[in-house]
A protein has these predicted regions:
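Conserved radical SAM core fold
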Residues: 61-63, 89-92, 111-127
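Residue-level signal for the nucleotide or nucleotide-sugar donor/cofactor binding architecture
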Residues: 34, 65, 128, 156-159
């Protein structure tokens, strides 16, 4: 069989402090990240293996200082690879940043929802970012970039998952 995807953990650093995240145990070490050369070597191996999707994740991959360089490298050196980012989306409230990611080659995005409202979001993450995430979804919708919304289901939010889906829908996310 063919290896279809590869996940690259770019950084352990994150701008949130989600109570359910595996990075919590690791200490959210922002300095614990791959070098640009290490990422390029991994991408080259993926290209040699005809990998179709490279998932860039973390921590929070949007905080990785060489992210745009990685996307450009994939676009220029391995155009058959579809780069995908799994993110909390908070930094995508900046429409200019969204556009730079797309211009550099981002082709797919997964935004991890953290709650059905601002209170639940802050309780889960330690950060008041609910409105920023909804703006980010609206920004992404306006770009035509393909994306999904996902959500870690916990005992605390299981009864409100449908409300979180509705909030994403009201921000412009479609369900196809």
């Amino acid at each position: 069989g063919r290896l279809k995807q590869c996940t690259i953990v770019l950084t352990r650093g994150c701008n949130l402090r989600c109570d359910f995240c595996f990075e919590k145990e690791a200490g959210y070490r922002a300095h614990d990240r791959l070098s640009l050369d290490e990422v390029k070597r991994i991408v080259d191996l993926c290209g040699d293996a005809n990998v179709r999707y490279v998932f860039l994740t973390g921590g929070e991959p949007l905080t990785y200082p060489h992210l745009l360089d990685v996307l450009r490298y994939i676009k220029e050196e391995h155009p058959s690879i579809t780069p995908t980012i799994a993110t909390n989306g908070v930094l995508l409230e900046d429409m200019g940043f969204c556009q730079r990611l797309i211009d550099c080659g981002l082709r797919y995005l997964d935004i991890s929802m953290k709650g059905a409202d601002a209170t639940e979001w802050k309780r889960a993450t330690g950060f008041d970012g609910y409105a920023k995430q909804l703006r980010a979804i609206s920004n992404i919708v306006s770009t035509e970039l393909e994306f999904t919304c996902s959500m870690v289901i916990t005992e605390e939010n299981v009864t409100r998952v449908c409300e979180a889906v509705q909030a994403a829908h009201e921000s412009g996310a479609r369900h196809d």
